[in-house]
Curated annotation (Swiss-Prot):
CDD domains in the cross-refs: homeodomain (cd00086)
Function field: Seems to be involved in the development of cranial sensory innervation from peripheral ganglia.
Molecular function per GO: DNA-binding transcription factor activity, RNA polymerase II-specific; sequence-specific double-stranded DNA binding
Biological source species: Gallus gallus
Record's keyword terms, sorted: Developmental protein, DNA-binding, Homeobox, Nucleus
Region annotation (Disordered) ranges: 1-68
Covalent S-S links between cysteines: none
DNA-binding residue intervals: 172-231
Annotated localization: Nucleus
Superkingdom of origin organism: Eukaryota
Cited InterPro entries: HD, HD_metazoa, Homeobox_CS, Homeodomain-like_sf, TLX1/2/3
Biased composition (Pro residues): 32-52
Official protein name in the record: T-cell leukemia homeobox protein 3
Encoding gene, per UniProt annotation: TLX3
GO cellular component: nucleoplasm; nucleus
Length: 297
């Protein structure tokens, strides 16, 4: 039994290929995969936007130092709207660097400047892709350019004046029909005899005066309106005149009753004080001065 135990002793101390040391030192073994490479360093910051000899800046560069560099690449999706000539007669084309160059000049006075869409940075390798939001933006830009180009030649100058003067003028009224003196005289005679005409009478009168039925009807309507107004004015004038006459008669009667002479009392004739009191009328408007009374001593 001892030799068997001695034979197993060295077998237990034999190194194991999958132990902790072998697992921790796995890369050192043959056939193990190499470690992944370290990540590349970040790219350097982009240079400032270049300027042309005429002082025109490139729109594709960053504005105000904002981190929006214009990446070089094709613009097949948004290059078509800018190649068309705008209302100023300038072709907006993309530069090889992927930016839009605008010449430094002032717009034509009176023209409507079209809105300049914001430049969309292109991603290398994705120039042929199309997204829904890109389609809507492209369609919106094209519609705006088309509308601006269509409205520019037909610019209407606004009138200076009151706002209501810009409205559509009212419809011109029909000129007033004029009749001859003979026609007016015959119409007046017939109106004084008869204020209202039947259809047959109106037709006969129109035929005799060489007028239309509508003209005779309109004339009689206007004449009746004038007659009613004149009659009302005459009645009002008569009523006012009658009122003034009644007031005048009442005033005269009242004054006559006040101015009637009073029969003097025989007793007052011998007494000057009583005579003065009898002749005193304080209700008169124009009272005469009372002479001084001398008392009899």
């Amino acid at each position: 039994m001892e030799p068997a135990a001695g034979a197993q002793g060295p077998h237990q101390h034999e190194p194991i290929s999958f132990g902790i040391d072998q697992i921790l030192s796995g890369p050192e073994q043959d056939g193990a995969p190499p470690p992944p490479p370290p990540p590349p360093p970040p790219p350097p910051p982009p240079p400032p936007p270049p300027r042309g000899p005429d002082g025109a800046a490139f729109l594709g560069g960053p504005r105000g130092g904002a981190p929006y560099p214009a990446l070089p690449g094709p613009f097949p999706a948004i290059a078509a709207p800018f190649e068309e000539s705008g209302p100023y007669g300038v072709n907006l084309s993309l530069a090889p660097g992927g930016v839009i160059r605008v010449p430094a000049h002032r717009p034509i006075p009176g023209a409507v400047p079209p809105p300049v869409p914001s430049a969309i940075p292109a991603v290398p390798g994705l120039g042929g892709l199309s997204f829904p939001w890109m389609e809507s933006s492209r369609r919106f830009v094209k519609e705006r350019f088309t509308a601006a180009a269509a409205l520019t030649p037909f610019t209407v100058t606004r009138r200076i004046g009151h706002p209501y003067q810009n409205r559509t003028p009212p419809k011109r009224k029909k000129p007033r029909t004029s009749f001859s003196r003979v026609q007016i005289c015959e119409l007046e005679k017939r109106f004084h005899r008869q204020k209202y005409l039947a259809s047959a009478e109106r037709a006969a009168l129109a035929k005799s005066l060489k007028m239309t039925d509508a003209q005779v009807k309109t004339w009689f309507q206007n004449r009746r309106t004038k007659w009613r107004r004149q009659t009302a004015e005459e009645r009002e004038a008569e009523r006012q005149q009658a009122s003034r006459l009644m007031l005048q008669l009442q005033h005269d009667a009242f004054q006559k009753s006040l101015n009637e002479s009073i029969q003097p009392d025989p007793l007052c004739l011998h007494n000057s004080s009583l005579f003065a009191l009898q002749n005193l009328q304080p209700w008169e408007e124009e009272s005469a001065k009372i002479p001084p009374v001398t008392s009899l001593v």
